[in-house]
Amino acid sequence: MHADEVPVSAGLVTELIDAQFPRWRGLPVSRVDSPGTVNAIFRVGDRLAARLPLRGGDPAGARRALESEAAAARELAGATRFPVPEQVALGEPGPGYPLPWAVQRWLPGRTGDEDDPAGSVPFARDLAEFIAGVRAIAPRGRKFSGRGRGGDLKNHDAWISTCLKESEGLL
């Protein structure tokens, strides 16, 4: 999908785990089917997941992103009642894979694209509670920007207005 995409497989993840985390050697590794294009996710045994960045250009940037995501997950875990993936190890580049990667707690459940939660009142309440919890986290001077992820809300006004107008029959 991406020009700089790094190929990954369950065999590669097994080799990385065996070399870097011998305590998890022998655990079964299987790819998690996901629509994501930024990370590949592999189930490791019953309690872990390996997340491998798929964009191969910048190992230092990948490490910063993984460390930042782990810090954000810790902060999020304290702000809501909902479980979040907890990073338990940070892997290093290895033979066949040029980037740092993460091992985190496996969270059981299903992704939102597996079911249509549109008519679920409990889901809507949970989502509202989660968003309120996230909004209550103090930004502490941090700036959030990025294409489609954060930034100045007024820059997204036209797109959101279009989405809301086209969703009138659903809302």
State where each predicted segment sits:
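ATP-binding pocket architecture of kinase catalytic cores
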Residues: 2-3, 26-170
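Juxta-kinase regulatory segment immediately upstream of eukaryotic protein kinase catalytic domains
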Residues: 1-23
